[in-house]
Amino acid sequence: MKKLSLLLLLSVFIFCGCSDDDDTKTYILSLPNYETHTLDMGDQENPDDSWSVSSEWGTTNYKYNLLTDASGIFEFDCVSSTYGFYSDSFAFTNCTVEDCPDFASYDYRAITKKGVINNTYVIVGAAGYKIGKNSDKEAAIRFRDHDNPNELEDYRVKGLYVTNSVYAYSSMKEGTGYYGEEEIFGSNDSFKLTIYNYDKTMHVDCYLAEGTNLLDQWKWVDLTSLGETKGLKFSLTSTKKNEYG
């Protein structure tokens, strides 16, 4: 069962890299332009890693891929399972219409139905279940050294745009078939995204919903206060909780 905590982000992501000689370069996330509607979770036939987990409900198969943008600097963990996109990872998509084919039962599309610059954007699930074979990874973006991709590099992040997914927005506004009106937000409810620097010593909060005011546009989040960091980590909290969180 998915939590409410699923959002869409990173249609545009701007950050600066500073070298020892103060030669500052600015990088902007550069995502693929897909010719057809796509939910890109990496090479599903030849994943970087795979494993299975057995429970009383049966066996779930997992696949792990690393996704990078055109610059090779932004690195995203992508985990998919027997049931599709996993709850704590990233994927690329350009789905912008109501009837995008081949999506899993949950609606991962941006409520805006488009990106900020082009129609490709990044989705992230940050439900708090952890990812990876050893359950030791958080939903995080890592920054690779432009000259040495085997190493992480500190960058000053300017910010990024975020918005709600169709699923999160609809559940807050109308409820879903699982819990009905219990999920509908009232005046005292909130849905908050927290973005940390890589070692989680600093953070920035951004509200995706405050009361019945639900975010339905791309919203710029200033991250300059995080200083230099080797990546970003994400968590989501909501006043609406159930037995799954």
Language-model region placement:
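Terminal, low-complexity interaction segments
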Residues: 190-245
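Bacterial signal peptide processing site
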Residues: 19-21
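Sec-dependent signal peptide recognition
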Residues: 2-9
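Short edge beta-strand/loop segments characteristic of extracellular beta-sandwich folds
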Residues: 161-163
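Short coil-to-beta strand junction motifs in C2/discoidin
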Residues: 171-193
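C-terminal motif of bacterial Sec signal peptides marking the signal peptidase cleavage site
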Residues: 14-17
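Extended extracellular/luminal ectodomain segments enriched in beta-structured repeat modules
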Residues: 152-159, 228-229
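N-terminal targeting leaders for non-cytosolic proteins
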Residues: 24-144, 152
